């Protein structure tokens, strides 16, 4: 090893470039490996996980909790059922207002699943409606002395005898980890609590057909999936969702694959933990390509420097070492070098872990997940990568006879091999990665900047307004309008950037229509700048073009009446189509919207909206100038009226950006990979050009002696690099045309190939190639030819 260390010391550029390349690529592989391990091991601790299925349909993996008991009574293949729902909640704990997320579950939750219960009897902790189980993290936060069991938690106004519910903590569970249930859910209560959070999720009519994730446990030896057709027919007799053919299939998704395979599976408090299997595979492929890229660099540079160690290897052969012994020595050195790079990569991965968690929005813990089996895997990876990286240079050095090295024929043969092909491959990879990144980045930015059909800039929204009386709402608006920064205050039930109330029905031709209700007062619609294209009367509802299209009506229709009698309303106004939530969703599934607009919400028992949904739930405030001042005033007024801490105010612009977070994360990861790939490519090209020019120093010196111009020598050297770049471009263009739409479809984007990103990528890679070669060539051309000839 002593001679190897001397070699690394003499060639510091070689050492640095290979350490950087292997280190960064393996660090990414470590992080991605931990990410995928955690994703693929979600819920794998469930002892009956293979027998537990989530009930759903072709549209979403959700149902109503009352369906569970009906199916169990009908189908003996079902051993048990358990429903899970999630809500945002605000509690009073010893006078402190606490915001958290809560699960409303069937009483058998801790018997059905293997989530660890640290304190309490799993058969009894949720048998009463007022019992609550809290997470270890939640208990430690509010009862650090460890005496949480038996304490009371109050939902609602504790000073109002009819307006609050008191829960008693009956047990403590471990925090949710490697589960489809987000760890932000810290409290668990009996399903009777649906009445306090979402009454439509409790009613026997099962109006809220997707209020719960319903799990069915199959009896051992049974085949529950063979009963899906029978389940569908049975549910047509009692479940309106199937009776009116709003959905046509029954799906059973195993708990073990729910993380990847669930469709539209969420709680009211947010989505369940989920992943995209194709995207995970794409990340791994890219990371492996970056590693291959780094190995190419190692091979390329090692081959270029084989002549530097040729005399050493010739001497070893002459001293009695066999060809195999020389080969194994070189492979051992490569594995040792890879092991050093891997050690550094592990430390780099630990340093980048928090940033990776933020970008991937998925928990990782590399240190915690490193066990004996993992370490054995690491050793195998080091051995394989080291052997692959060292195979080619070891084969070359051990394959020639010592006499070839003494004569100098070895040097002449090696100079012409490997480097050209590997440099072309590097350039191809760089062009394709850069093209895909630029194209997807431009596509996402374009969609984010696309007009939505309404205003969202300089608008704040806040919820909980349903806690205010009519007089308080009027005073709230009046006092805010007294501020010079406030331009308007409107009340409603949600903006197009929120989850709007919906009603699923059926048109006469059998088309299932899932309408969204956009409801607000006149100020609400003025602030959003949503106005009708046509107004027919003062009574009735507004509709957009998409709603008319789905019911098979023309744009001048004045009413919609279905033969079944489910729908019968008068059209007062026609509104333009608007984007509901994201452009991507709207492109796939245009949203029919029913608009209910009133001058002002009063306590009107005859109002359909207020009878169904209660008082207005939220306010939007149009402002200019100092946002913090307006936000502060909103909080002060809410607390003054209710005595409770005000919910956070959010800007609609921020909510608009949040809808694109998944796409932004994907783009961020892809950008990082591209940057690393380009960095490795640039370093490799710099080194290769340096060694390539270095090997031709004698030729350059001889040409200088015979009077060649510096420019002609430089251009002659650059010709090879330009040809390599052109060959790379020819290969990269069809690859980019194929890969960009594929990567886009995996991330949920419809991407069409554009010329400019491809052209820009070609120019960037060509400039980097030519510039690095030009600098090295110019330095070689301007060097004193005497030194080059003397050294040869």
Which residue ranges define each predicted feature?
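Hydrophobic alpha-helical transmembrane segments of multi-pass inner-membrane transport and secretion
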Residues: 10-39, 274-311, 339, 343, ...
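C-terminal transmembrane helical bundles of large multi-pass transporters
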Residues: 644-729, 742-745
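Transmembrane alpha-helical interface segments in multi-pass membrane proteins
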Residues: 16, 21, 312-354, 677, ...
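Mid-to-C-terminal secondary-structure elements
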Residues: 106-119, 132-275, 475-478, 482-658
């Amino acid at each position: 090893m002593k001679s190897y260390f001397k070699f690394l010391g003499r060639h510091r550029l070689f050492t640095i470039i290979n350490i950087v390349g292997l280190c960064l690529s393996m660090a990414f592989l470590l992080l991605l490996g931990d990410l995928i391990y955690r994703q693929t091991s979600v819920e794998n601790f469930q002892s009956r996980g293979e027998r537990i299925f989530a009930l759903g349909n072709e549209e979403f993996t959700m149902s109503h909790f009352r369906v569970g008991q009906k199916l169990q009574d009908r189908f003996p293949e079902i051993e048990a059922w358990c429903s899970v729902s999630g809500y945002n909640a605000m509690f009073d704990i010893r006078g402190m207002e606490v915001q958290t997320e809560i699960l409303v579950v069937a009483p058998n939750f801790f018997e059905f699943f293997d989530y660890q219960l640290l304190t309490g009897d799993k058969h009894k902790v949720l048998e009463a409606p007022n019992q609550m189980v809290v997470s270890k993290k939640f208990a430690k936060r509010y009862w650090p002395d460890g005496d949480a069991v038996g304490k009371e938690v109050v939902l609602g106004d504790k000073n109002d005898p009819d307006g609050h519910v008191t829960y008693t903590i009956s047990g403590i569970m471990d925090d949710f980890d490697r589960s489809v249930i987000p760890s932000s859910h810290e409290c668990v209560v009996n399903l009777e609590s649906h009445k306090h959070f979402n009454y439509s999720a409790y009613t026997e009519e099962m109006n809220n057909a997707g209020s719960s994730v319903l799990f069915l446990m199959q009896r051992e030896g049974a085949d529950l999936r063979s009963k899906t057709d029978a389940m569908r027919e049975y549910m047509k007799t009692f479940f309106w969702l199937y009776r009116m053919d709003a959905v046509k299939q029954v799906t059973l998704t195993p708990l073990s694959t729910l993380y990847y395979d669930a469709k539209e599976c969420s709680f009211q408090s947010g989505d369940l933990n989920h992943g995209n299997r194709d995207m995970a595979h794409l990340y791994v492929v890219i990371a492996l390509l970056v590693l291959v890229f780094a190995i190419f660099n190692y091979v390329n540079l090692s081959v270029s420097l084989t002549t530097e160690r040729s005399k050493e290897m010739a001497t070893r052969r002459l001293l009695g070492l066999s060809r195999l012994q020389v080969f194994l020595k070189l492979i051992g050195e490569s594995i040792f070098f890879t092991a050093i790079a891997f050690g550094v990569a592990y430390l780099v991965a630990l340093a980048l872990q928090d940033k990776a968690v933020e970008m991937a929005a998925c928990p990782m813990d590399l240190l915690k997940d490193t066990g004996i089996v993992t370490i054995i895997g690491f050793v195998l990876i080091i051995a394989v990568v080291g052997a692959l990286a060292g195979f080619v240079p070891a084969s070359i050095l051990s394959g020639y006879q010592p006499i070839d090295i003494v004569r100098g024929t070895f040097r002449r043969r090696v100079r012409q091999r490997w480097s050209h092909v590997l440099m072309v491959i590097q350039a191809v990879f760089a062009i394709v990665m850069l093209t895909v990144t630029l194209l997807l980045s431009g596509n996402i930015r374009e969609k984010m900047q696309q007009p939505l059909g309404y205003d969202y800039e300089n608008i704040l929204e806040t919820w909980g307004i349903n806690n205010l009386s009519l007089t308080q709402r009027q005073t709230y608006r009046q006092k805010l309008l007294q501020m010079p920064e406030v331009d308007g205050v409107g009340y409603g039930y949600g903006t197009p950037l929120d989850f709007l109330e919906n009603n699923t029905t059926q048109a006469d031709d059998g088309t299932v229509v899932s309408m969204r209700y956009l409801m607000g007062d006149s100020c609400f619609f003025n602030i959003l700048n949503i106005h009708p294209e046509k107004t027919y009367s003062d009574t009735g509802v507004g509709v957009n073009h998409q709603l008319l299209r789905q019911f098979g009506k023309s744009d001048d229709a004045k009413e919609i009446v279905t033969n079944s009698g489910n729908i019968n309303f008068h059209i007062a106004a026609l509104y333009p189509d608007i984007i509901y939530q994201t452009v991507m969703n709207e492109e796939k599934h245009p949203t029919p919207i029913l608009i209910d607009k009133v001058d002002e919400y009063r306590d009107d028992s005859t109002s359909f909206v207020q009878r169904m949904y209660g008082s207005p739930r939220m306010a939007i405030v149009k402002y200019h100038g100092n946002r913090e001042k307006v936000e502060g005033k909103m909080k002060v007024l809410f607390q003054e009226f209710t005595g409770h801490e005000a919910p956070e105010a959010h800007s609609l612009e921020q909510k608009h950006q949040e809808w694109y977070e998944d796409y932004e994360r994907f783009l961020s990861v892809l950008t990082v990979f591209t940057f690393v790939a380009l960095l490795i490519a640039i370093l490799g090209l710099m080194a290769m050009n340096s060694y390539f020019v270095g090997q031709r120093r004698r030729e350059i010196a001889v040409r200088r002696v015979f009077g060649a111009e510096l420019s002609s020598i430089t251009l002659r050297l650059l010709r090879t690099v330009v040809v390599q770049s052109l060959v790379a471009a020819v290969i990269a263009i069809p690859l980019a045309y194929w890969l960009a739409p594929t990567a886009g479809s995996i991330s949920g984007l419809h991407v069409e190939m554009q010329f400019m990103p491809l052209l820009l990528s070609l120019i960037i890679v060509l400039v980097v190639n030519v510039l690095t070669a030009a600098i090295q060539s110019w330095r070689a051309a301007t060097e004193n030819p005497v030194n080059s000839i003397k050294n040869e």
